[in-house]
């Protein structure tokens, strides 16, 4: 068992009151119970019986994270360890400092020395999530929560919120994994292509600067509620920084020109949303894995950010080389990506508003009028293809849920994004929701347009900033306050990284195609370092690297990436 330093965090912050007398051990007929806050945390007659019976009824499936909330004395946990599959893991979570000390003093030694147990004391949800991601058995397939004692009831909100956030974390990992499988080699291909594009046009490389925007930000999603907020966007355009998602551009232009547009999509269909639409004064915030032709079609100053959908070896090498731009959490939603960028770019205390992040719909279209998905639906309508096909009216998994004012329709992916929103924004102040419809986003404050105007006016008056943050414009070369040029040797480091990748692929190809016997350890090492060759394989993470079937599939990918990396420019301008 491993556990971090308990530090000086005060558990009173969880309950909002002052800790009372320290917990007191009381002997019973079967082990000890604990008296704390005038409550017995176990039975005062037979302390261990109830927990041992509960453990005997548990059926722990493989690859399960067992979350034990408030373990206190650890009753029943040793028996639980004997029933857990080797691929499962036990996380003991405690948010009361006095109970944590009690656990460390009286927990069974078998529990202390177990390799599949981790004990964590914290009062912060983010620390819980970071710990889960670092566990040796991660990724898990499900989570099982158990109450380790009666102290669970005293901190129920914290433990329930921890469980929900861990569940969202696990779901996000597998959704991203499925996305990688469905997108095939696009993820790695787009990253390499965008790097090569930067080498071919070094003067167009821009990096985002955290905490650089000091005016209120408005994030515009493409949800149906944007239609009701469009007039507000037009009225406040000159006093806010308007950050729009890719598919919402057509719903705003031409009268409302955003300050920046976020591009996340790696598939080809997003290209049509940018053809001939964006003025040159708009900045493009593009994911490093975004579709390269869409970046070129936008034809505006591009600032790359990065979404690490997988912890691949080639990504770690890029990070070590210092060529990975500003990174955000892989949520899978362009609206959530825009929200994370806004949180990273705003200065301290600057308010953020958002509209169109509904994660649901009611009547009519699933997106705002004029947005790219609605335009695509109109363009595909013929005498034989209805404007409302069955797949649009009744998508797979559709269900009716409680909204802010009335019932709304949603699907599992959108509900997951709503949960991810709550996780990402739980600890960020000054975040406001302008929409009066859609799923309830409990971690943000819903405000009217009049209230938003007051907040924006107060912020602009206090900071004396009412103009768009553009520093210099000359000969179509635009410099933004939120961007900076990279280091002088940035292009050299990118070229060295890509050249090294190409050399490793050439060596692997030679060893797989030569008639002479090759060193299997070298082949295995080359395949492991070039994991982008098989990231999209369903069995990629647990593949046997020297199986004939696997090697044939890897060999089929080699020529594609070698051809792509042959575009590396021989010299830099």
UniProtKB/Swiss-Prot annotation:
A Pfam family that this protein carries is MptE-like
Which protein are we looking at? Uncharacterized protein TP_0930
Q: Which organism is it from?
A: Treponema pallidum (strain Nichols)
């Amino acid at each position: 068992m491993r556990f971090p330093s308990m530090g000086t965090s005060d558990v009173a912050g969880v309950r909002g009151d002052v800790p009372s007398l320290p917990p007191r051990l009381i002997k019973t007929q079967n082990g000890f119970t604990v008296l704390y806050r005038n409550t017995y945390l176990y039975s005062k007659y037979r302390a261990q019986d109830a927990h041992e019976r509960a453990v005997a009824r548990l059926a722990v499936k493989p690859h399960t994270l067992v979350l034990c909330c408030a373990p206190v004395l650890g009753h029943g946990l040793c028996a639980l360890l004997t029933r857990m599959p080797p691929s499962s893991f036990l996380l003991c979570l405690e948010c009361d400092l006095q109970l944590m000390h009690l656990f460390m003093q009286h927990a069974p030694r078998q529990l202390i020395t177990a390799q599949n147990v981790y004990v964590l004391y914290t009062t912060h949800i983010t620390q819980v999530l970071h710990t889960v991601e670092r566990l040796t058995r991660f990724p898990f397939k499900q989570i099982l929560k158990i109450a380790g004692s009666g102290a669970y009831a005293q901190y129920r909100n914290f433990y329930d919120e921890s469980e929900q956030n861990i569940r969202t974390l696990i779901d996000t990992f597998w959704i991203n994994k499925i996305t990688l499988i469905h997108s095939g080699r696009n993820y790695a291909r787009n990253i390499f292509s965008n790097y090569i594009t930067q080498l071919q046009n070094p003067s167009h490389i821009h990096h985002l600067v955290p905490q650089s925007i000091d005016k209120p930000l408005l994030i515009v999603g493409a949800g149906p509620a944007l239609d009701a907020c469009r007039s507000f966007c037009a009225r406040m355009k000159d006093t806010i920084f308007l950050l729009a998602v890719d598919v919402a551009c057509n719903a705003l232009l031409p009268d409302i020109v955003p300050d920046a547009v976020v591009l996340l999509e790696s598939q080809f269909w997003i290209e049509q949303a940018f053809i001939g639409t964006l003025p040159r004064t708009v900045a493009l915030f593009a994911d490093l894995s975004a579709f390269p032709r869409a970046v070129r079609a936008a034809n505006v100053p591009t600032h790359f950010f990065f979404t690490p959908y997988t912890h691949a070896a080639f990504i770690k090498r890029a990070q070590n080389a210092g060529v990975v731009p500003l990174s955000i959490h892989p949520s899978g939603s362009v609206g959530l990506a825009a929200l994370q960028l806004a949180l990273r770019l705003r200065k301290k205390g600057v308010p953020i508003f958002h509209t169109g992040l509904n994660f649901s719909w009611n009547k009519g279209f699933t997106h705002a009028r004029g947005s790219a998905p609605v335009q695509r639906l109109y363009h595909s309508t013929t005498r034989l293809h209805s404007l409302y096909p069955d797949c649009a009216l009744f998508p797979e998994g559709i269900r009716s849920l409680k909204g802010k004012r009335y019932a709304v329709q949603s699907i599992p992916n959108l509900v997951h994004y709503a949960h991810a929103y709550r996780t990402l924004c739980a600890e960020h102040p000054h975040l406001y929701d302008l929409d009066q419809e859609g799923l309830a986003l409990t971690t943000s404050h819903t405000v009217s347009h009049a209230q938003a105007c007051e907040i924006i006016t107060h912020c602009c008056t206090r900071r004396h900033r009412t103009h768009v943050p553009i520093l210099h414009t000359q000969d179509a070369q635009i410099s933004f306050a939120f961007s900076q040029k990279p280091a002088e040797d940035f292009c050299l480091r990118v070229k060295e990284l890509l050249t090294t990748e190409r050399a490793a692929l050439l060596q692997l190809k030679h060893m797989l195609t030569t008639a002479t016997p090759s060193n299997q350890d070298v082949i295995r090492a080359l395949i492991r370092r070039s994991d982008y060759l098989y990231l999209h394989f369903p069995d990629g993470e647990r593949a046997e690297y020297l199986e004939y079937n696997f090697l044939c599939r890897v060999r089929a990918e080699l020529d594609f990436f070698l051809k792509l990396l042959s575009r590396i420019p021989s010299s830099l301008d």
